[in-house]
Structures are given as structure tokens and as C-alpha cells.
């Protein structure tokens, strides 16, 4: 076989070809595999099937942690339960010879399994007697995988997960625009207004209008943090979100420099008209001054007509 990095091989090779390649193992004496591994420095293949994994303690090289993780992620991705059980059973003292392998056992394995959304392996790891795994510690990884089954398993098998961890999981779901996860976490008590409404603000950053509307329907206190909300609505400009926030009467302070500048620069006249219609006071003279500098004629004409009417 040509020597290529395992990650590249796994990403560019059909699963049937991978299986055919691994079947070659039965035709080659283990002593030869051991010699090939020592000479080439490529230990990845030893971590992809039970028969070769047993050679690991006899190899005279050290593999970087990231190479081990590539192999472990492959095992989890392709649901190689028998190989994983071999690792878990710890049939040789790899902790003594290769201390870095301790990172794979078993908390790190649970971390990677939740990250990959593999419920079967999560259940296997959780079933280990006298394990030191605290399921709630892996809630964020499960959320990142967007695996509702793994998230539900964690809630159903841990007990009372602290409010802070649930809120952090909600925050991650908003960053990833995962509506199903958001709905589930809110049903489990996630506080949508915690930490200055940060979860809602993360939803604003993504511009996902469906999620934004869901938060509002669930009682998000958007007017308590209107400045931050408008900032992220305007950086960058999200036209559909702007229209929606106006439709629900979101307060706006046009004297705030971080709101004022993008409105003038992008000539968002509808927001200025909105502020005037709602009676929100702001320095119109200053707004006209900066509009002249940037030659924003529609803003100049509109505000000058308002100023003249007030005189």
C-alpha cells in the first residue's frame, strides 16, 4: 500500500475499499506488520482493527496524540464497536508505555463519541462499571453534533443538570442555528434571558429569523438589551431581521455611536423613520451633519423636513 496520512485515506476512500484493505491483514503475518510499522513510523493502521491494535504495546515509536485521535474518530464514525471494546478492556498496559493514550480513556472517548453523535458508543461508555464519566460534562459536545438522541440520553440518564450548563448548551445551539436543540433545551429549563439575553443575541448574529421569532414567542426580553440587539442586527446589515425587529416595536437609540454610524453609512432611512414614528428622541442635527459628510441625501431631506416642521 502507498503510505498516505490516515485522515486523507479515510476521507478519500470508499468504505468497501477500506474493508478490502483491512482484509489483507489476515494474509500478512503480524511480525511483518510490526516491522513495517517500526520502519515507517506509521502507527495509525494499528489503531483501526482489533487484531493489529494488540501490536501497539510492542511498537518502538510514539504516535502524536492527534494521530491517535484521527484513528479513534474513525472507529467512532464507522461504529467499530469491537475495536472500541478492545480499547476499553485495556488488555495491555498502554498507560504505562504511552501515557498520552490516557487521553483516549474513557472520558476522552466519551468526548469524541458525543462530538460525533454516536449514541450506541455513548451508551457503551456510560455502561462501564466504576466509570468516572459525568454525562453532563459532555452536553456541549452532544449539542455541537446536533444529535438530539444523544442530548436526550444525557438528560434522561444524569439527573439534575445544573442551570449554567443548560444555558451554555442553549448558547451553543444558537450559534449553530439548531432549532430542534433550542426547543428541547428550553423545554428542559434553559433560561432564554440569562446573561443579558446572550442566547437571543447569538441568534441575532446568525440572522436566523425562524429562531429569532421562536425566542420572541418564548418571551425573550429583547427591549432590555436593545442596544446590543441592534448592534448585531447592523453588523453586518440583516435586512429581514431589521424589518422584523421594527414590527415588534423594538426600542432603538440613534444617539448610540455603534447604531448611528452603520445607519448613516448604509443609508437605512427606514430605521430613522421608525425612530421618529415611535417618538424616540435623538440628535437630529448631528445626524444631518454626518449625513451631509457622507452625502446621504434621503436622510438629509427627511430629517430637515422634520426639523423645519418643529420650528
From Swiss-Prot:
Coiled-coil region(s): none
Which species?
Acanthamoeba polyphaga mimivirus (APMV)
Q: What InterPro entries does its record include?
A: Ankyrin_rpt (IPR002110), Ankyrin_rpt-contain_sf (IPR036770)
Q: Which domain of life is it from?
A: Viruses
Q: Which UniProt keywords apply?
A: ANK repeat, Repeat
The ANK repeat boundaries are 67-96, 105-134, 136-163, 165-194, 195-224
Among Gene3D superfamilies, the record links this protein to: Ankyrin repeat-containing domain (1.25.40.20)
Q: Under what name is this protein listed?
A: Putative ankyrin repeat protein R825
Amino acid at each position: 500500500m502507498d503510505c498516505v496520512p490516515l485522515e486523507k485515506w479515510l476521507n478519500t476512500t470508499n468504505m468497501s475499499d477500506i474493508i478490502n484493505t483491512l482484509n489483507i491483514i489476515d494474509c500478512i503475518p503480524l511480525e511483518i506488520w510490526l516491522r513495517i510499522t517500526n520502519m515507517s513510523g506509521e502507527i495509525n493502521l494499528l489503531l483501526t482493527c482489533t487484531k493489529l491494535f494488540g501490536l501497539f504495546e510492542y511498537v518502538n515509536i510514539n504516535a502524536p496524540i492527534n494521530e491517535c485521535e484521527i484513528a479513534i474518530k474513525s472507529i467512532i464514525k464507522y461504529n467499530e464497536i469491537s475495536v472500541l471494546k478492545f480499547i476499553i478492556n485495556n488488555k495491555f498496559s498502554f498507560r504505562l508505555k504511552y501515557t498520552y493514550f490516557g487521553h483516549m480513556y474513557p472520558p476522552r472517548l466519551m468526548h469524541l463519541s458525543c462530538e460525533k453523535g454516536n449514541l450506541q458508543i455513548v451508551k457503551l461508555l456510560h455502561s462501564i462499571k466504576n466509570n468516572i464519566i459525568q454525562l453532563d460534562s459532555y452536553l456541549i459536545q452532544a449539542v455541537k453534533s446536533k444529535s438530539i438522541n444523544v442530548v436526550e440520553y444525557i438528560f434522561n440518564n444524569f439527573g439534575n443538570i445544573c442551570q449554567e450548563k443548560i444555558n451554555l448548551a442553549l448558547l451553543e445551539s444558537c450559534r449553530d442555528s439548531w432549532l430542534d436543540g433550542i426547543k428541547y433545551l428550553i423545554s428542559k429549563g434553559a433560561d432564554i434571558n440569562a446573561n443579558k439575553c446572550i442566547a437571543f443575541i447569538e441568534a441575532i448574529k446568525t440572522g436566523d429569523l425562524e429562531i429569532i421569532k421562536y425566542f420572541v414567542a418564548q418571551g425573550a426580553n429583547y427591549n432590555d438589551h436593545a442596544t446590543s440587539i441592534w448592534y448585531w442586527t447592523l453588523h453586518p446589515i440583516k435586512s429581514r431581521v431589521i424589518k422584523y425587529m421594527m414590527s415588534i416595536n423594538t426600542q432603538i437609540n440613534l444617539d448610540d455611536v455603534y447604531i448611528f454610524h452603520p445607519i448613516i453609512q448604509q443609508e437605512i432611512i427606514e430605521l430613522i423613520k421608525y425612530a421618529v414614528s415611535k417618538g424616540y428622541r435623538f440628535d437630529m442635527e448631528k445626524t444631518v451633519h454626518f449625513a451631509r459628510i457622507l452625502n446621504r441625501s434621503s436622510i438629509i431631506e427627511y430629517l430637515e423636513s422634520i426639523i423645519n416642521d418643529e420650528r
